[in-house]
Amino acid sequence: MPNNHPWAARKNIDPKELSDEKVLLLNSGHCFSLQVVESCPDLSKKGEVLQGNSLETIRNMVASNLGITVLPKSATSDRYQNHLIKVIPFIKPIPSRTIAIAYRKSFVRMNAIEIIAEAVRLIKTDTIEML
């Protein structure tokens, strides 16, 4: 949210509170937007929802005071910091998502799949929890 938003001093937010806010999401049909709407079902019923093409575009829209957004935790790390916005986590239970590597049984380059899976396992960050 923008630094000047009334909630900017809060430690956390209940997803239900987003229903009365102008919320910026990725374009409809994007899997992350669908997950946000599933986590905040009242969002599209009451509040105004605007769309952007990328998380970076949405982050800049928030910095310009056009609304607030929900970001995946991986998009809130230090390398994405912007002094014009404030990141505030949801209350527990914090919504999460599961991502998997899927491939056909007949896929002939299993070595490529194993290398990708190993690369994901080697990622050292608190934004990913391996199952």
Model feature map: region roles:
Residues W7-A8, E21-L43, R109-I113, A117, ...:
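Secondary-structure junction motif
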Residues L25-L26, K45-S54:
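Short beta-strand-to-loop elements that line the ligand-binding cleft
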Residues P2, L26-N27, L71-P72:
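Thr-Gly-centered strand-to-loop micro-motif
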Residues K16-D20, P41, V62-A63, Y80, ...:
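Alpha-helix boundary recognition
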Residues C40-V49, L84:
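A local structural motif
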Residues R10-K11, E17, T57-S106:
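Beta-alpha-beta core module
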